[in-house]
Amino acid sequence: MSQALSPAKTPKIGFVSLGCPKNLTDSELLLTQLSAEGYETSKTFEGADLVIVNTCGFIDEAVKESLDTIGEALAENGKVIVTGCLGARAGETGGNLVKEVHPSVLAVTGPHAAQEVMEVVHTHCPKPHDPFLDLVPGGFGEAGIKLTPRHYAYLKISEGCNHRCTFCIIPSMRGDLVSRPVGDVLKEAKALFEGGVKELLVISQDTSAYGVDVKYRTGFWDGKPVKTRTLELVQKLGEMAATYGAWVRLHYVYPYPSVDDIIPLMAQGLVLPYLDVPFQHSHPDVLKRMKRPASGEKNLERILRWREACPEIVIRSTFIAGFPGETEEEFQHLLDFVREAQIDRAGCFAYSDVEGAAANELPGMLPMELREERRARFMAVAEEVSTAKLQRRVGQTMQVLVDQAVGLGKKGGVGRSYADAPEIDGVVHLLPPEKFSKTYKVGDFVKARIVGTQGHDLVGVPV
């Protein structure tokens, strides 16, 4: 009597994603490929056949978190593949930093290395044989597994950066700018909208430079020519989003003159009037030491023009306080800039050495106490500006995208307006609907009248 063969155990992969949204999209790509090949994911290190850690390596805190996570995975599992930005960093002896600290990891790759990672996975954890899955063509889907909630997603349009800012080591880890074909980007965007995404967050290392590397060559989408350039891409994304009743939000936008052409699209309502612009500083001399691609005076003039063309525009930015050689006068210039530009949302880091960054060799390194003191002073001014702008929202009616619903949507909720990007900005606390028949549902848009503020957040009631 023949005995049926027991099915082979499906390999399980543990996965940890650390760092920024750009890293998150790399993780989504890997998870999509793992799923397409028949692997399952494990929620614990112990329950996995091996673990992949996608690391961040930009600042010291991120390096420590990544190394600690790798150590934890090794202790609880023993088989670990490391990928991401930290994988590209050299250690004290000139070798790979991860290998120096954790020599027992199976393999180390840099960022954006899905094929390399999959080859290591195949070596140490052969993919399951499935006669049906084996018929599926290889490659990555347009909109595979997402690590964000279903109603919003990140859309990465390029990889790498052509700038050589002295405080940054990202080009050494992620390379020069490589723009995705415009047709591929739009294809993924459509798949995301078709899948229920209500907010598309456009990301890259330098969104404004999209297409520079390919000399803005003409691509094709839906049988029609489209230039590989930020303006044309944003216009197409906005038009597409409008047909689905969705939002498009722009991140990591360097303040090039070409950005001026995008502001009218915001004024027309085609894309959200929101710009995430990494200014880093305002004083011309500091910007020169940073090797930033813009001057402080032009930045202020540009912002004022943007606000004139689109009064509703919200500007988020990040800054560095205590950069090597920064004088008190230069720092005061930065504080004045934040007030005059009326930066809606601002974050600030006290300058810290990043191994491999050119800024480490600059003269005039300031004591850490002074750097931290300036960061605190900056944040006090930034919060003054932000608080005043939030207060002016009281009485307005705003469209809010619901992120959380309490008590089946009858006891209130939490959402965001056009002025709030997920995780980095404030939220709108939604009070319970006055009519019992009304409920909040995650991923829905609601109209809310703003009745108050709460720290960095707003409070609204449905209308």
Swiss-Prot record:
One of its GO terms (molecular function) is metal ion binding. One of its GO terms (cellular component) is cytosol. Residues 147-388 form the Radical SAM core domain. Keywords: 4Fe-4S, Cytoplasm, Iron, Iron-sulfur, Metal-binding, S-adenosyl-L-methionine, Transferase. Gene3D superfamilies: Methylthiotransferase, N-terminal domain, Nucleic acid-binding proteins, tm_1862 like domain. Residues 11-126 form the MTTase N-terminal domain. GO terms for biological process: tRNA modification. InterPro entries: Elp3/MiaA/NifB-like_rSAM, Methylthiotransferase, Methylthiotransferase_CS, Methylthiotransferase_N, Methylthiotransferase_N_sf, NA-bd_OB-fold, Ribosomal_uS12_MeSTrfase_RimO, rSAM. Its main location: cytoplasm. Its cofactor is [4Fe-4S] cluster. It catalyses: L-aspartate(89)-[ribosomal protein uS12]-hydrogen + (sulfur carrier)-SH + AH2 + 2 S-adenosyl-L-methionine = 3-methylsulfanyl-L-aspartate(89)-[ribosomal protein uS12]-hydrogen + (sulfur carrier)-H + 5'-deoxyadenosine + L-methionine + A + S-adenosyl-L-homocysteine + 2 H(+). Catalyzes the methylthiolation of an aspartic acid residue of ribosomal protein uS12. This is Ribosomal protein uS12 methylthiotransferase RimO. The gene is rimO.
